[in-house]
Amino acid sequence: MKAILGKKVGMTQVFTEQGEVVPVTVLQSEGMVVVQKKTEEKDGYNAIQVGFGDVKIKNVVKPKKGHFDKSKVEPKRFLREFRVDNIEEYEVGQKLGVDIFQVGEKVDVSGISKGKGFQGNVKRHGHSRGGMSHGSKFHRRRGSLGASAGVGKVVKGTKNHGHMGNEKVTVLNLEVVRVDADKNVILLKGAVPGPKKGLIKIREAVRKNK
């Protein structure tokens, strides 16, 4: 499976040859390098371990630094593992970029959504609010929990107020609009989860025909 790590730069818009405006998210994947190879004979599966993002040496813990030193690779901020079909295509120290994807290709994008803190039902789940005037005491409070007298308690999993955001979100089938291999920049159609400078994982779509 083809996959890379990137940093979210922000959103902009581009024009197609037909003059249509397309909203795109700009992602940069610079400095991603193969740190370790895992083979089916030794580890039971084929995968590569990649490092991404600059980091100061003083901020790298010794076990992690030793892992990079063993591969003779400069320490990176993030360390992730990707399953691959053909392990022979990769070598330790090899740099990977956005050129593994083509314009028009569909990809899946994963990131950590923006944290919203503690929020109520209306914002967190989109529940309808009550009247805002004329003696209403409902306003933005939650409605019936549907527990009735037979249960007598709040059922686990009931949509309620609570912590919102700051969780892994995956968006499927985003289209690759442009690829700039020189600057290691890729433009994807639509929005991508997470804040600016957030870590993003881009992989080939698993549901290409849907």
Regions found by a protein language model. Name each.
Residues 1-210:
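Extended basic (Lys/Arg/His-rich) segments that typically form rRNA-contacting surfaces
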